[in-house]
Amino acid sequence: MSENRRVVVTGIGAITPLGNSVSDTWENMKNGKNGIGSITLFDTEKFKAKLGAEVRGFDPKEYLEVNEVLRTDRYAQFAVAAAQQAVDDSGVEGNVEPERFAVIFGSGIGGISTFETEHTKLIEKGPRRVSPLFVPMMIGNMAAGTIAIRHDCRGSVMPAVT
C-alpha cells in the first residue's frame, strides 16, 4: 500500500430471507420477522431439518439478461442484485476513475447449487454432460468479478470466502 486512504460506503443493497431490498429487509426486521420457513429449494424428506432461511420472490431477470442468468449461480445473482441496489442508492454519477472503485465480496461457499447440479450430471450422464461453465459459475470469486465487470471497477477485486 503506497498511502492510507479512507474508504467511503456510498450506497447499500440487500437480498436476504427478510426481503429483496434494504427497505424490505429493514421493515421486516423491525416487525420481528425472522425469514425462516419451510425449505422449498430441495427435497427435505430424508432430512430431519425442514426449516431454513431462504431468499424468496427473487427474480434474477430484474438485474441480469436471460443469458447472464443461465451462466451465473444463484449466489452471484444475489450479489449482482445487491451491488446494483447499492450503486443506485449511492447516487454516484459522472466521471469517476474506475481505478478508485473496489469490490470486496464475502460469501460462505460460492456456487454450491451449480456444484450440486453439475455433480449430478457427472454421476448420472457422464463427464461430457458437465457444463464447461461449471468452474467459473461455482468459484467463490465469481460474484466479486461479475460485479467489478458490470460496474467497471478496476480497483481491488477481492472475494472473502468464510
Per-region residue spans from a language model:
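Conserved "HGTGT" condensation-loop signature of ketosynthase/thiolase-family condensing enzymes
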Residues: M1-V157
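Short beta->alpha junction loops
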Residues: P159-T162
